[in-house]
UniProtKB/Swiss-Prot annotation:
Protein name: UPF0266 membrane protein YobD
Keyword terms, alphabetized: Cell inner membrane, Cell membrane, Membrane, Transmembrane, Transmembrane helix
Location relative to the cell: Cell inner membrane
Transmembrane segments: 6-26, 45-65, 67-87
Organism: Escherichia fergusonii (strain ATCC 35469 / DSM 13698 / CCUG 18766 / IAM 14443 / JCM 21226 / LMG 7866 / NBRC 102419 / NCTC 12128 / CDC 0568-73)
Transcription regulation is among the record's keywords: no
Length: 152
């Protein structure tokens, strides 16, 4: 096994661990889920570049008669990238004492101020940073508001 194959296996394992944590473990942490809201995706150009570069590497490996295991590992990495960037839906998960946003736990007590912008972006001011929450469905903002009012 070459160093290239070892690095590919490590990247695949890391992406697989992230996908399992995001889909199965995170919703079960810190109590029952009160509300899970799908969010808008960020720009997909990075994901297109990532998957495109992997496809170029697969093509290069096949045309140069490279190791077959490397081709399979690159294909698995491309599939994991496709899942992470295009199939998985980013979401904000509200719990009793806080919420998960971008896979980070934030307690309600850390929220100093909340504003709603004209284009439907919920802005939460924390101690040292702002969270810009872009929901997929504008009606979900009312659900978030009702939940935050009832838990505070």
């Amino acid at each position: 096994m070459t160093i290239t194959e070892l690095v590919l296996i490590l990247f695949i394992a890391a992406l697989l661990a992230f996908a399992i944590y995001d889909q199965f473990i995170m919703p079960r942490r810190n109590g029952p889920t009160l509300l899970a809201i799908p969010l808008l995706r960020r720009g997909r150009i990075d994901s297109v570049i990532f998957v495109g570069l992997i496809v170029i590497l697969i093509y290069n490996n096949v045309t140069n008669h490279g190791a077959q295991i490397t081709t399979w590992l690159l294909s698995a990495l491309a599939l994991m990238g496709f899942y992470i960037f295009w199939i998985r839906v980013p979401k904000i998960i509200f719990k009793q004492k806080g919420f998960f946003f971008a896979n980070v736990w934030i307690e309600y007590s850390r929220i100093k101020a909340m504003n709603l912008s004209e284009d439907g972006v919920l802005v939460m001011q924390l101690e040292q940073r702002r969270l810009l929450i872009r929901v997929r469905n504008i009606d979900d903002l009312e659900k978030i508001y009702k939940l935050l009012v009832s838990t505070q």
